[in-house]
Amino acid sequence: MVNEIDSESLSQRLADTEDVLLVDIRTPAEIAQGMIPDALQLPMHLIPIRMSEIPKDRDVVIYCRSGARSYQACAYLMQQGYGRVLNLRGGIIAWARHGLPIVAPEG
């Protein structure tokens, strides 16, 4: 079973400067529309070959548009031995609905 976090709880953890890595697994076209500040851009299909960029020793929150793809990505990472992954429930849609910050991607 995949552990999940809601937008408000994640926002609070980030405000408290907790050591959380955000990973945006959406496509580059989706990311171009905006992303959560300071998130690592790692399209879902590249996770198997770029897994080494995801630390096992800190909490990692994976998100996509609605939370469905990120749920699958979390399940995959858990199968690979990652115990500290969380799915952002409702994805960036829920984040935006709560009025939380979205920024343009760098580069």
Curated annotation (Swiss-Prot):
Superkingdom of the source species: Bacteria
Annotated transmembrane regions: none
Effect of C64S: Loss of sulfur binding in the presence of thiosulfate
GO function terms (MF aspect): transferase activity
Record note on disruption phenotype: A mutant strain lacking rhd_2599, tusA and dsrE2, although not viable in liquid culture, is clearly sulfur oxidation negative upon growth on solid media containing sulfide, and shows massive accumulation of intercellular sulfur globules.
Enzyme Commission designation: 2.8.1.-
Pathway(s) annotated for this protein in UniProt: Energy metabolism; sulfur metabolism
InterPro entries membership: GlpE_sulfurtransferase, Rhodanese-like_dom, Rhodanese-like_dom_sf
Keyword Transferase: yes
Enzyme class: transferase
UniProt keyword terms in alphabetical order: Cytoplasm, Transferase
Major site of localization recorded for this protein: cytoplasm
One biological process term in Gene Ontology: sulfur compound metabolic process
Any one Gene Ontology cellular component term annotated for this protein: cytoplasm
Transferase keyword on record: yes
Consequence when changing C74S: Still able to bind sulfur in the presence of thiosulfate
Rhodanese domain segment(s): 16-104
Role this protein plays: Sulfur carrier protein involved in sulfur trafficking for oxidative dissimilatory sulfur metabolism. Component of a sulfur relay system that starts with the sulfur-mobilizing rhodanese-like protein Rhd_2599 (Alvin_2599), which transfers the sulfur from a low-molecular-weight thiol, maybe glutathione, to the TusA protein (Alvin_2600); TusA serves as the sulfur donor for DsrEFH, which persulfurates DsrC; persulfurated DsrC very probably serves as a direct substrate for reverse-acting sulfite reductase, DsrAB.
Subunit (UniProt): Monomer.
Record protein name field: Sulfurtransferase Alvin_2599
Species, as recorded: Allochromatium vinosum (strain ATCC 17899 / DSM 180 / NBRC 103801 / NCIMB 10441 / D)
